[in-house]
């Protein structure tokens, strides 16, 4: 390999997430549903987050992508891979491309270039599909 091969930026270079602001406390949930709090606490934890009325899996993912681009000052035109991992997609074939479109519109609105046209946009689902 030549020297330039070793200088390429490969791998994960940043991480960002979006966590919805809405939370359900599981102790309260147990009171409402007549479930056993000690068991739920041990198995699930103390709370879980839920999306708001203006949120979807796509808006939450697009928000996380925009945070990643902004926090790490990433050139969107240089992004070659944008993977969406979810158990909650409403469209089993187009979720990641929907997120890419949302991100491209947000980038355009902020005066930045869109993600690369050659950016790969797969969607991954690995858990809870069987019910």
Task: Name each region found by the language model.
Residues 1-83, 103-108:
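Conserved "HGTGT" condensation-loop signature of ketosynthase/thiolase-family condensing enzymes
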């Amino acid at each position: 390999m030549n020297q330039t091969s070793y200088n390429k930026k490969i791998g994960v270079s940043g991480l960002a997430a979006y966590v919805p602001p809405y939370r359900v406390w599981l102790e309260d949930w147990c009171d409402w549903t007549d479930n056993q709090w000690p068991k739920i606490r041990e198995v699930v934890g103390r709370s879980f987050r839920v999306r708001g009325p203006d949120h979807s899996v796509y808006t939450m993912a697009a928000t996380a992508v925009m945070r990643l681009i902004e926090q790490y000052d990433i050139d969107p035109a240089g992004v070659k891979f944008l993977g969406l991992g979810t158990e909650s997609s409403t469209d089993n074939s187009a979720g990641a491309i929907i997120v890419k479109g949302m991100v491209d519109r947000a980038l355009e609105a902020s005066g930045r270039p869109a993600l690369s046209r050659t950016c790969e946009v797969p969607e991954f689902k690995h858990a809870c599909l069987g019910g």
